[in-house]
């Protein structure tokens, strides 16, 4: 569709980009196409997809198998909280040398845990990675441990993307952490509190 092509043309080579597209407009396909373009041009060889619990499995069973071009060899693993030997073997394949795109899909809650953070850090240190947050309002609370952890991880991601149809759920301050994930300089404020002091009138 034309709107998807427009979004892809504007975003594909940017280090950071927000897909603020309404539900049903195909933003997931745009992101996967963007990932494929960066891989084909040698810009990335890894992807860390962070999604809410309700849709994280869909990325693994439907979105990536449907939209990732068939010519791209890939190793795709869905993170599990309880790591069995089989799961560990799958995770280990993400670090094997060779060609191909390495993709890990993680529930956003996993990045509240030491186990999830340690793995994500290792993955980012070993790959040129696109890190994408599906339903990015899941990181709107700057005090939440998962938000702080994800903002830390973002520093090591070569490309960063966020996606949501509703970037503001309660008030405009919801935007701070989402934009900070993309690039701290987008808002000209490196602190949530200085951002709030500049733009918000707090009521008691």
Model-derived regions, located:
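Conserved Walker A/P-loop ATP-binding site and its immediately adjacent core
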Residues: 28-30, 43-66, 169-174
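Conserved pre-motif I regulatory segment
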Residues: 1-21
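Conserved P-loop NTPase motor "coupling/switch" region that bridges the ATPase
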Residues: 46, 66-67, 72-77, 81, ...
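Walker B catalytic acidic pair
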Residues: 134-136
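Hydrophobic anchor at the beta1->P-loop junction of P-loop NTPases
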Residues: 19, 49, 163
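Conserved nucleic-acid-binding Ia/Ib motif block in the N-terminal RecA-like helicase ATPase lobe
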Residues: 55-103
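Conserved helix/coil segment N-terminal to the catalytic DExD/H
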Residues: 84-103, 108-127, 141
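Walker A/P-loop
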Residues: 14-34
């Amino acid at each position: 569709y034309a709107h998807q092509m427009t979004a892809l043309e504007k975003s594909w080579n940017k280090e950071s980009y927000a897909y603020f597209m309404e539900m049903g407009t195909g933003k997931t396909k745009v992101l996967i196409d963007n990932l494929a373009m960066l891989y084909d041009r040698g810009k990335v060889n890894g992807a860390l997809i962070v999604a809410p619990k309700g849709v994280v499995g869909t990325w693994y069973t439907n979105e990536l198998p449907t939209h990732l071009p068939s010519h791209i060899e890939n190793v795709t693993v869905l993170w599990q909280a309880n790591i069995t030997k089989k799961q560990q073997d799958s995770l280990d394949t993400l670090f094997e040398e060779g060609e191909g795109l390495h993709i890990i899909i993680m529930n956003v809650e996993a990045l509240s845990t030491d186990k999830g953070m340690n793995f994500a850090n290792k993955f980012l240190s070993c790959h040129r990675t696109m890190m994408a947050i599906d339903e990015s309002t899941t990181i709107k609370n700057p005090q939440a441990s998962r938000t702080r952890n994800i903002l830390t991880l973002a520093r090591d991601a070569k490309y960063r993307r966020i996606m949501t149809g509703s970037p503001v759920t309660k008030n405009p301050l919801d935007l701070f952490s989402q934009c900070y994930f993309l690039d701290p300089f987008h808002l000209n404020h490196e602190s949530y509190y200085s951002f709030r002091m500049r733009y918000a009138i707090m009521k008691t």
